[in-house]
């Protein structure tokens, strides 16, 4: 059984390890990375969810941000990070995290839940479609630094 709870400041090392496992580009020094994590944890327009297995090991993380949209009265829920350890994939961890994110977004009055996924992450795409998300289009980006 997966326990989903709010992430805390002391979960930093576990969350950082998940980001590394996913291959996310990250700040290289721990002090700066911790400062970024702390800033994000203190954001009132965000929620950060952690998944633990039966033995209390961290097996997943989901960040959820509430963003205003000019064409909507209600905010949009955006998931910039949904990470499940490779060993815990296909064990309903991602489903538990995304379900909690959806529940929080609904309680917040959000009109839409969205996330982005790299085009090559085909297994993740199947999971998202199976969860009920739709392919709403493409995301474009440009590195600025």
Describe each PLM feature range.
Residues 1-4:
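Extreme N-terminal starter segment of soluble prokaryotic enzymes
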Residues 6-13, 17-74, 80, 98-99, ...:
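Acetyl-CoA-dependent GNAT
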Residues 47, 111, 134:
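Short acidic/polar active-site loop segments enriched in Thr and Asp
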Residues 67, 85, 118:
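Residue-level recognition of the GNAT/N-acetyltransferase active site
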Residues 74-86, 138:
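Conserved acetyl-CoA binding element of GNAT-fold acetyltransferases
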Residues 84, 90-103, 130:
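Conserved acetyl-CoA-binding loop-helix of GNAT-fold acetyltransferases
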Residues 95, 107, 119-138, 142:
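Conserved active-site alpha-helix within GNAT-family acetyltransferase domains
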Residues 98, 105-116:
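Conserved GNAT acetyl-CoA-binding A-motif
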């Amino acid at each position: 059984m997966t326990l989903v709870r709010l992430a805390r400041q002391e979960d930093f090392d576990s969350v950082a390890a998940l980001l590394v496992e996913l291959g996310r580009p990250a700040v290289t020094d721990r002090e700066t990375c911790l400062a970024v994590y702390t800033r994000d944890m203190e954001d009132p327009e965000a929620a950060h969810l952690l998944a633990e297995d039966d033995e209390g090991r961290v097996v997943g993380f989901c960040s959820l941000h509430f963003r205003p949209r000019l064409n909507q009265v209600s905010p949009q829920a955006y998931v910039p990070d949904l990470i499940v350890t490779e060993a815990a994939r296909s064990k309903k961890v991602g489903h538990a995290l995304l379900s909690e994110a959806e529940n929080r977004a609904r309680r917040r009055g959000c009109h839409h839940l969205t996330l982005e996924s790299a085009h090559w992450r085909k297994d993740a795409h199947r999971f998202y479609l199976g969860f009920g998300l739709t392919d709403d289009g493409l995301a474009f980006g440009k590195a600025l630094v």
